[in-house]
């Protein structure tokens, strides 16, 4: 993979394209029944003033949001979708050159402790050797899940949790990744590139709520509560070809599109882009509002950098989705490798 220029240069390029998006949620270090869906918010700014999006419909103590929709019945229904036994890896390979939202990066260091110059461990008669490894980096690199503590509105996160009450440098004390149950559910894929009759949408290209609805109707995609909705834009094809461009802009949805998807009561919304939303933002002073709608207001998880290419090549629009989250206590996001099965 082509190496991305220095993190400082990459940050500058991304910030120009994103209209100052880096000033959003990463600027500071502290950072079985289905009830009816809550009314859509009129906008994140108004919601921040009204505070009418909490407590959660699952109660004031809830920490898992839309994961409450993962009932045993839902899981059993989803398992029936695995008819051929074919699996698809939806995660991408991550290394120190993977483009990521600035200033994120990740690096793997491999070592052979106390084995310099061909020495073996403890002078063992069977000459045992081993390698160990260490990861240094951020959890928001590559294919990732955004947990409910990842992004909020004016310091308030899902279910009214205030940052000063639960965000610690050692990890969040509520809404952590470790609280999320395994995802075993139905997923649907909406091919937005095919809807636009192009192999790939452009950076900053907005897919409106009406277009989402039309694409789903065209492709006979129906979302049921607890599903994972996956959006294919073709953007991931740039990650090797042009990593700088890939990481500095992207096609996607906006707040209105997020509100439409939230009205369908999915478990999660994902895409083959690094942020799901269209970047640069139409208004550089209104940033990541779709994240606010999904995560903070509705408790719906976000999945980024999903590798949808093989699914699209095979014409798959409905499949079993399986994901076991990394159990890092107090983390707000995590590098993942979901599996699609049909």
Mark where each language-model region is.
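N-terminal secretory signal peptides and thylakoid transit peptides that target proteins
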Residues: 1-19, 28
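A generic secondary-structure boundary signal that marks alpha-helix termini
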Residues: 19-20, 61
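Signal peptide processing junction and immediate N-terminal pro/mature segment
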Residues: 23-35
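Active-/binding-site microenvironments in catalytic and ligand-binding cores
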Residues: 34-342
């Amino acid at each position: 993979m082509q190496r991305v220029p220095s993190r400082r240069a990459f940050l500058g390029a991304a910030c120009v394209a994103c209209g100052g998006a880096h000033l959003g949620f990463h600027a500071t270090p502290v950072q079985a029944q289905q009830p009816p869906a809550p009314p859509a918010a009129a906008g994140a700014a108004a919601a921040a003033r009204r505070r009418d999006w909490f407590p959660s419909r699952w109660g004031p103590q809830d920490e898992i949001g839309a994961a409450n929709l993962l009932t045993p019945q839902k899981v059993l229904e989803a398992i029936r979708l695995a008819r051929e036994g074919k699996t698809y890896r939806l995660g991408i390979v991550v290394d120190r050159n993977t483009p990521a939202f600035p200033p994120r990066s990740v690096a793997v260091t491999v070592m052979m402790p106390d084995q310099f110059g061909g020495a073996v461990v403890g002078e063992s008669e069977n000459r045992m050797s081993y390698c160990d490894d260490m990861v240094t980096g951020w959890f928001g690199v590559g294919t990732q899940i955004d947990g409910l503590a990842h992004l909020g509105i004016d310091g308030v996160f899902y279910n009214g949790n205030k940052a000063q009450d639960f965000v610690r440098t050692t990890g969040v004390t509520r809404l952590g990744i470790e609280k999320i149950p395994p995802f075993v559910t139905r997923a649907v894929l909406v091919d937005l590139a095919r809807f636009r009759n192009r192999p790939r949408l452009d950076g900053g290209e907005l897919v409106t709520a009406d277009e989402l609805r039309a694409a789903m109707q065209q492709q006979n995609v129906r979302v049921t509560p607890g599903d994972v909705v996956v959006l294919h834009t073709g953007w991931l094809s740039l990650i090797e070809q042009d990593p700088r461009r890939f990481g500095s802009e992207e096609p996607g949805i906006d707040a209105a599109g997020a509100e439409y998807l939230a009205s369908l009561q999915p478990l999660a919304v994902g895409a083959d882009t690094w942020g799901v939303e269209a970047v640069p933002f139409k208004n550089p002073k209104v940033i990541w509002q779709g994240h606010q709608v999904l995560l903070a207001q509705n408790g719906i998880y976000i999945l980024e950098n999903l590798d949808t290419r093989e699914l699209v090549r095979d014409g798959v629009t409905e499949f079993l989705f399986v994901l076991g989250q990394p159990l890092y206590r107090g983390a707000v996001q995590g590098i993942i490798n979901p599996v699609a099965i049909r």
